[in-house]
Amino acid sequence: MSKNTIKVVELFAGVGGFRIGLEGASDAYETIWNNQWEPSTKHQDASLVYRARFGSKGHSNQDINTVPTADIPDHDLLVGGFPCQDYSVASTLSRSGGIEGKKGVLWWQIYRILNEKGDNRPSYIFFENVDRLLGSPAKQRGRDFAIILASLADLGYTVEWRVINAAEYGMPQRRRRTYIV
């Protein structure tokens, strides 16, 4: 690892989308630890794919709620696509759980890790979610996103965000996503 290496931790890693993108963009990025756990299934398929592609070193396949922050190495950049089911068009907005939903609450694990890292928290963050995050919950549109932004500000982060549609970048699908940097 060179002096100019950007050490990355990837939460809610799936099959490694952030890692593929970052490490493909520059040799400066090195993913040193990642976590992928799917609580609703016995088969941890995404974790198995991740390990098959990148190896087991630094890979955690356990419930993020149970991972002590001390087990997560210090890093420069925290990335993650925190679970979107409670914001997704797959459920009606009026029935989506948002930040209080079954998986929406996992946002607070990101906050916990950043908060508990204290002076060793990463300098940079990069998160992704569906665009409906901006309007959640239905009865208080925008509340959840405002809570997320305020939580990051309370930790000392200056945050920018954008909604980006993959179709505008030549992808053969309309896939609007919210990015928080």
Map each language-model feature to its residues.
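Conserved active-site and SAM-binding loop architecture
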Residues: M1-V181
